[in-house]
């Protein structure tokens, strides 16, 4: 019903192209129209993960004057998908934007894990751009599996040198109300104190990891002094 309503809205305004119709869902099962965006949304990979349908390719087909490659009835919906926006911001400081040099970047991968990223190791995060660095999208057979996969992936997302919201996202995923689907649009505000509670201080581990990522520094530390090289191996 909700899909047919969305299609009806697009037909009513004679819209042709990729777009998004947003609704808000009530506890009694009713849904209410919010807005229509005549473009792909940031969250469009969620649809792609669930359906296996390439929305960008279809958008280009329509722009070229062609029709859709598949009928609505032939588009499957499999499993559950979640998207997380990885942002350079400090959740413990009222989501203040963060800047800095990316000293080390190690993005998660594996079955059911997708990362749409715009950053590289050695890059800079400045005030000239939106704080969103990348999108982490996961897919599972059901919601519990998708949440578990999202938690593992976000915990394995390493960005050193810039403060990010990965810890905050993990706290949301770990919250029992989120896992149960028992939340509303007020969830983040109501649970702000819990979700932004400071975690374990691992700054010393991050500094060590950053140092180990510097090949020049590691080579310098591991270099055998000339005097010891000449002596060769010996035992006392």
PLM features: what roles do these ranges have?
Residues 1, 31, 50, 54:
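Charged, alpha-helix-enriched surfaces in structured cytosolic catalytic cores
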Residues 1-25, 153:
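A long amphipathic alpha-helix within ATP-dependent nucleotide-binding catalytic cores
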Residues 6, 24, 45-236:
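Catalytic cores of soluble metabolic enzymes centered on carboxylation/carboxyl-transfer
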Residues 15-41:
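Conserved metal-phosphate-binding beta-hairpin within the catalytic cores
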């Amino acid at each position: 019903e909700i899909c047919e309503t969305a299609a009806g809205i697009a037909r009513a305004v004679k819209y042709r192209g990729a777009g998004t119709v947003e609704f808000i869902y009530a506890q009694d099962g009713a849904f209410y129209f919010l807005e229509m965006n005549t473009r792909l949304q940031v969250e469009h990979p969620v649809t792609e993960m669930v359906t296996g349908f390439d929305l960008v390719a279809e958008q280009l087909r329509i722009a070229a004057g062609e029709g859709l490659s598949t009928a609505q009835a032939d588009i499957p919906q499999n499993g559950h998908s979640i998207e997380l926006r990885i942002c350079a911001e400090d959740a413990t400081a009222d989501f203040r934007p963060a800047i800095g040099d990316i000293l080390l970047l190690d993005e998660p991968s594996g079955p059911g894990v997708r990362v749409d990223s715009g950053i590289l190791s050695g890059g800079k995060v400045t005030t000239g751009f939106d704080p969103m660095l990348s999108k982490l999208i996961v897919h599972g057979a059901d919601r519990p599996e998708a949440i578990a996969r999202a938690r593992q992936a976000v915990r394995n997302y390493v960005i050193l040198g810039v403060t990010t919201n990965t810890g905050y996202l993990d706290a949301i995923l770990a919250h029992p109300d989120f896992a149960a689907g028992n939340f509303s649009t007020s969830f983040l505000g109501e649970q702000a104190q819990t979700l932004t509670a400071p975690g374990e201080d691992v700054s010393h581990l991050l500094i060590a990891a950053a140092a180990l990522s510097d090949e020049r520094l590691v080579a310098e530390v591991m270099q055998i002094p000339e005097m010891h090289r000449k002596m060769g191996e010996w035992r006392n």
